[in-house]
Amino acid sequence: MAPDLTILYGAEIYYTSDVLEKLENQVIPSLNGTRYALIEFSMATPYREIHTALSNLLMLGITPVVAHIERYHELENNEKRVKELIDMGCYTQINSSSILKPKLFGDKYKFMKKRARYFLERDLVHFVASDMHNLDQRPPYMKEAYEIVSKQYGESRARELFIENPRIILADQII
């Protein structure tokens, strides 16, 4: 028997100049109608642009969840910058595939795995999510990632990243 599954409305939003207007007019969705929006940038977006974009979202009353922070070159091994984003009111997310061991997912994106570990070790991550686009090329691997986080950082931390924090924001509450 399959577990109960509830699908909630939301999207990963690639940040462009018209995102603020589209969010304000509800043309693109926040996460389940909450104050939270999952925001993605190009891997090569300069930090100043990331910071400005997130500041603009916050001024609009949208709380950004910065998608897969391990991808952004400007945040690599930069605890200060990630803390600055968190301190201004943002939350951060890493992908489950960035936690996996090479035998499960390959070694193509080793640099992302190192970055994800760096952020996890410094308690700079609020969520782990799948970034799943399809089952063939990008399966979720959530169970495998949960087990690794639980083993390396403790069951409590795994529950927080995979279960508790997502429930909190979907209820439109503050972590």
Language-model features: locations:
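Extended substrate/RNA-proximal surfaces in nucleic-acid metabolism proteins
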Residues: 1-93
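Active-site environment of divalent metal-dependent phosphoester hydrolases
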Residues: 14-16, 71-75, 99-102, 133-137
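Conserved, mostly hydrophobic/aromatic
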Residues: 68, 131, 166
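His/Asp/Glu-enriched short active-site or ligand-binding loop at hydrolase and phosphoryl-transfer sites
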Residues: 89-103
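Short active-site-adjacent structural elements
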Residues: 101-105, 109, 136-140, 170
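Short acidic/histidine-rich active-site segments
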Residues: 122-139
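Mid-to-C-terminal alpha-helical segments outside catalytic/metal-binding sites
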Residues: 142-175
